Amino acid sequence: TQVDAGDYQITLANGQFLVADIVLSAVGLQPNLELAKATDIHCSRGILTNVLLETNQADIYAIGDCAEVNGLLLPYVMPIMQQARALAKTLNGQNTQVHYPAMPVAVKTPAAPLTVLPAPIDVDVTWETEQLEDGMIAKAMDNQNNVRGFVLLGATAAKQRLSLTKLVPDLIPTAV
């Protein structure tokens, strides 16, 4: 609820009230876009933003699982951390574009460790696979033989994570 110009009253689940000049909500894996659509914020699979995390509405930003930044909807911890760092600087007067390096997602299970770095949806790739005694390595190669993504299964393959990640280009490069 808006209280005064720029102030919001927030009611917590336990009934406690807080007053804030800004509200940030980033919860859930599947974006609920109802509120955004009801306020004419542009949406696709998520809330559409530019690299400054700005929506089409003045002074409204989106981060987290709901933010679709330059067509990328990445509901993982690392992209959210990148967004939070950039938006914090922007809200403090230093416009900062979000930077997305190659960010593999690891599923940490002792029996079958799995790491996945999806290839960009707009890049044609062919998969090269290598069977290992305890798993496999699959690399998504573009038409110029560059690694654009990978899947690593098993402890032996997991050791390749850092070296393969360094070969994959940034999803959103650092602003110059």
Tell where the protein language model's regions lie, with residue ranges.
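Short acidic, gly/pro-rich beta-turn/loop elements at beta-sheet edges
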Residues: A20-D21, D124, Q160-L162
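Mid-to-C-terminal Rossmann-like scaffold of FAD/NAD(P)H-dependent oxidoreductases
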Residues: C66-A158
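FAD-site-proximal beta/loop scaffold in flavoenzymes
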Residues: D7-T11, Q16-K89
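A conserved short coil-to-beta-strand element within the FAD-binding core of flavoproteins
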Residues: T1-G6
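Residue-level recognition of phosphate/Mg2+-coordinating polar/acidic sites
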Residues: A26-V27, L153, L167
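A short, polar/charged loop-to-alpha-helix boundary motif
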Residues: T156-P173
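Extracellular ligand-binding/catalytic regions of CAZymes and related secreted enzymes
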Residues: V176
